[in-house]
Every structure is written in structure tokens, then in C-alpha cells.
Amino acid sequence: MLTIITPCCRPANLQQLFNSINFTHVNRWLIVHDTTHTNGVFKGVFNHPKITEFGVSGGISGNPQRNKALDQVKSGLVYFLDDDNIIHPNFWEIVPRLNIGYFYTFDQQRWDEFVGKPGDIFKGDTPRLQKIDTAQYIVPFYMCGTWKEDDYKADGLFIEDIYNKNKVSHIYIPEVACYYNYLRRPTK
């Protein structure tokens, strides 16, 4: 089963994330609110049996929040869903094909000019720093390390470490199965 981890500093976006999740394939969705600027206080958004919400202060880019959520996971596959994104519909087509013995990467639909022109595809075939985005991988919990809490590039370092330790367990799925910052894309 799949555990989704969302570090959250934009609670207004959570309903859109919720609407993109197929809970049939999800064991738990862990939402970790960044309470750095709220004196440790947060207001939970959902009352759902598969959703757990809690708060953590400090760090950058949601990294301490991801680590705290990983403390709650014991097994299964893990997917990191940022609070400025939603899950791509194709994601739910690949999830039933996944095996706990491997970590997976896939392609991403971009809205910026990072890979060329807006709308181009960012390949997920290179799980290395600055070659992949957080939304482009699913990993078994037992392969997970911790996120560097004070490093903006922690997502790339996290997956690169997994890749370096488990190269023979990497499967690249050459399909678009995620977006890049979908909720921040330009709209016309």
C-alpha cells in the first residue's frame, strides 16, 4: 500500500490535493503542517479515516515535516506530494503495477521553461541531484533515509542516496505520471 506524505504551509490548497487522491490505493495520507510561524498551532482540515494531520516547526522546504512523517511510516511505498501540486491521473494507472522491492521514477509535465518550453516533459530516468523532482519518485519505506532539514536541494540528495544504494532496484517508467507545481502553473 501507498503512504502519501505532504509537508504543508499552504492549507488552502489541501482540498485540491484531496480531490486528486484515489484512496482505494492509499494506506495513509500524512499531512504535516509547518507550524514555524503559528507558535506550534495548526488547524486540521480533514476528518477522514486515512488522513492524519500533525504539526512540526523549523527547517526549509518542508524537509523536517517529511522526516517527522517518515517517523510514522513502518512499511509499504512512500510518495511525497507537495502542497502546491496535485496527483496526475496517470499516477493511479501505474500504482497497481508497483512492487515493494523496487523504487520507481517517471516523467513529469512541466509548466515552466526548465526543460524547454512550457508544457514540455521532464524525464525521470536520472534519479540524481538537479535531474529529478520530488513528485517523480515512489520509494519503499525500507529504502528511505532522512531529508537534510536545512538544504533546499534535499529532494535530489534524498533520491540520489537511494539510487546509489539500490541501483539494481530502480525502475524507470517512461510515462507522464506527475505534474510540476500544478497549483502554481500559469492560468489564462
Sequence positions of predicted segments:
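Short, well-formed alpha-helical segments that are part of the catalytic scaffolds
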Residues: 10-23
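Short beta-strand/loop segment that forms part of the nucleotide-sugar
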Residues: 26-38, 52-57
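A short, conserved alpha-helix in the catalytic core of glycosyltransferases
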Residues: 152-168, 173-174
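Active-site donor/metal-binding and catalytic loop motifs
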Residues: 110-114, 135-136, 173-188
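Glycine-rich, basic loop-to-helix element that forms the pyrophosphate-binding segment
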Residues: 57-72
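Conserved catalytic core of nucleotide-sugar-dependent glycosyltransferases
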Residues: 88-153
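Hydrophobic targeting segments
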Residues: 2-6, 21, 27-31
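Short beta-strand-to-loop acidic/aromatic patch adjacent to the donor-nucleotide binding site
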Residues: 75-86
